[in-house]
């Protein structure tokens, strides 16, 4: 059984992580990450030539048969280029391939995060029934709101997964309660398009907090999303607590809408950097109740589990499985 050594990467606005992985040609053996990742500071690189020259120097003793990089930014239609969000750093598959002497594939970073979901090691289930090998929805509130669908393909070596990426985070935000309608009206005064990402990400939590302050008639403090989360979870600030309650409600509705839209009988997974930081709160919050409030389809969604992905670095794992599935 031939085994090849490949290179995968998770390139974000803050850090770029590169790691070797081993993939068998017939996929009879699960792929595995090899060694320790190389972690570089993305903002220190003004060009991809500088970045990949350092990567090549670090892995100079290794010859790669393929490479796949998950990058924080929209990949162009032909898959050949991407700009790392908030950095201006352009990455081209052809130039990276020349510098690293191997073929390079580019995918969006949430594409890789979604691919990592079926292989996550740390999961916490919130309600619903059994986790089935059926269509799965993935939501990822973090610096933005990623959204994707996982479709199973039952092959000779078990279930393989295809990621259907989307920009569902930019779908319209639909209020479901009078409170949410009031919040929406305040948000609409400051945002040309009030979408899910307007409230369901780090910056969105700040937007939601400021709108909540407007309803309370209080002045919004200059605080971070992390501080809002901390105050809300400890109940030391009633405005922050109600902000988190609203966040959980919007998240539950968005997760259920995704489940209904794609038929995610295999579960809706919540990944990204925010959920693990407020895990206990979300478990006891309106999240699950709002997920199940779907009128005639309440029984349908009641059987669908919500699963919190707690793995700290799913990007490299997802990139590895993306590369394996592309063979």
What are the roles of these predicted feature ranges?
Residues 1-59, 63, 182-327:
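ATP-binding/phosphotransfer module of carbohydrate and carboxylate kinases, centering on a glycine-rich
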Residues 4-10, 66-70, 105, 136-140, ...:
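Short glycine-aspartate micro-motif
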Residues 14, 110-111, 143, 274:
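A generic "binding-loop/recognition-motif" signal
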Residues 16, 74-76, 144-148, 207, ...:
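Short, acidic Gly/Pro/Ser/Thr-rich loop/turn segments
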Residues 43-46, 72-76, 112, 275:
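Short active-site-proximal "capping" loops at secondary-structure junctions
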Residues 74-135, 167-176, 283-297, 301:
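Glycine-rich phosphate-binding loop and adjoining helix at the ATP-binding site
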Residues 94, 98, 112, 181-182, ...:
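Residues on a specific face of well-ordered alpha-helices
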Residues 126-128, 132-195, 280, 286-292:
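Glycine-rich phosphate-binding loop of actin/hexokinase-like ATP-binding domains
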């Amino acid at each position: 059984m031939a085994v090849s050594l490949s290179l995968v990467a998770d390139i974000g606005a803050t850090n770029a992580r590169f790691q070797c992985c081993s993939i068998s040609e017939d996929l009879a053996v699960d792929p595995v990450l090899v060694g320790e990742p190389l972690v570089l500071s993305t903002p220190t690189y003004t060009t991809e030539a500088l970045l990949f020259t350092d990567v090549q120097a670090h892995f100079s003793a290794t010859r790669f048969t393929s490479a796949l990089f998950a990058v924080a930014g929209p990949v162009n239609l032909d898959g050949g280029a991407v700009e790392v969000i908030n950095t201006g750093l352009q990455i081209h598959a052809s130039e990276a391939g020349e510098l690293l002497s191997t073929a390079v594939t580019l995918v969006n970073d949430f594409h890789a995060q979604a691919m990592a979901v079926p292989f996550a090691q740390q999961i916490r289930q919130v309600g619903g029934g059994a986790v089935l090998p059926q269509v799965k929805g993935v939501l990822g509130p973090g610096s933005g709101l990623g959204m994707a669908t996982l479709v199973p393909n039952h092959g000779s070596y078990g279930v393989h997964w295809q990621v259907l990426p989307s920009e569902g985070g930019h779908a319209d935000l639909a209020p479901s309660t009078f409170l949410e309608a009031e919040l929406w009206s305040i948000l609409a005064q400051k945002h040309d398009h009030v979408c899910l990402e307007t409230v369901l990400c780090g910056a969105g939590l700040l937007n939601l907090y400021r709108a909540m302050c407007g309803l309370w008639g209080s002045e919004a403090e200059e605080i971070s999303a992390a501080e809002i989360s901390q105050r809300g979870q400890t109940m030391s600030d009633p405005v922050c607590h109600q902000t988190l309650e609203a966040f959980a409600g919007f998240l539950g509705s968005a997760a259920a809408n995704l489940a209904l839209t794609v038929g995610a009988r295999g579960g809706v997974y919540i990944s990204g950097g925010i959920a693990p930081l407020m895990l206990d709160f979300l478990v006891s919050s309106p999240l699950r109740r709002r997920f199940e409030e779907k009128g005639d389809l309440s029984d349908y969604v009641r059987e669908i589990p919500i699963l919190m992905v707690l793995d700290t670095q799913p990007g490299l794992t997802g990139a590895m499985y993306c590369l394996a599935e592309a063979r």
